[in-house]
């Protein structure tokens, strides 16, 4: 078991009103599993993913990832934990526009203290794995949406994380590119035995997931 969540709750204040977004989520995910979490906008799935990634604290509950209780970690401890254990893929790619594909993929290794030579070698190797060997020196504005997402995927995997959290990774892509990206994610899932947790609206993801979990009104169905 690589992820264990027990009774996760989260409430937001909207003016004078408290809105309960997560109402007690309990979930276990095995190592190497490709899990899809589906649900309508406002169901709480992105909030849950942010809590899993240590980006947002929960109000109540326990989260164990890779045998680490993360709900009690401070900001510095969380940053170190994310760097060593997790990778993130976003709908909007979140690439640095002034950097090349190679430099974007290198970035997490800088924070890990990896030498320049090793950073370049590892970033090149990862870009080759995602099919961008010939686009390494292009900036995001010179790449298609699918190519930018491939750069984002390479960056997410560069530190060899145990867990990848993906928030609507195909949300900005056309149907053909969506299939290409999902094929890539599943291949990486199998080849690296990396655990994937994918939040999505897309029913296409069902075909790739080992398990599909529906979230509705802050609860798992």
Regions inferred by a protein language model and the residue ranges of each:
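Conserved switch/coupling elements of ABC/ABC-like ATPase nucleotide-binding domains
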Residues: 217-221
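ABC family nucleotide-binding domain
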Residues: 2-215
């Amino acid at each position: 078991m690589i992820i264990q969540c027990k009774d996760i709750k989260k409430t937001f204040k909207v003016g004078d009103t408290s809105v309960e977004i997560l109402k007690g989520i309990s979930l276990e995910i095995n190592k190497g599993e490709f899990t899809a979490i589906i649900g309508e906008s406002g169901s709480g799935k992105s909030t849950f993913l942010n809590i899993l990634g240590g980006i947002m604290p929960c109000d109540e509950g326990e989260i164990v990832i890779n045998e680490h209780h993360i709900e009690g970690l401070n900001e510095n401890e969380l940053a170190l934990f994310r760097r060593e254990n997790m990778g993130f893929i976003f709908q909007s790619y979140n690439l640095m526009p002034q950097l090349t594909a190679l430099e974007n993929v290198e970035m997490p290794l800088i924070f890990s203290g990896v030498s320049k030579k090793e950073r370049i070698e590892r970033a090149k190797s990862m870009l080759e794995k995602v099919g961008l060997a010939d686009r390494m020196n292009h900036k995001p504005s010179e790449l298609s949406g699918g190519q930018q997402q491939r750069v984002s995927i390479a960056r997410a995997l560069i530190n060899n994380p145990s867990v990848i959290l993906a928030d609507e990774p195909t949300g900005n892509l056309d149907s053909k590119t969506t299939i290409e990206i999902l094929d890539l994610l599943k291949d990486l899932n199998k080849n690296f035995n990396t655990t994937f947790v994918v939040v999505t609206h897309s029913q296409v993801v069902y075909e790739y997931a080992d398990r599909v979990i529906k979230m509705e009104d802050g609860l798992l169905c």
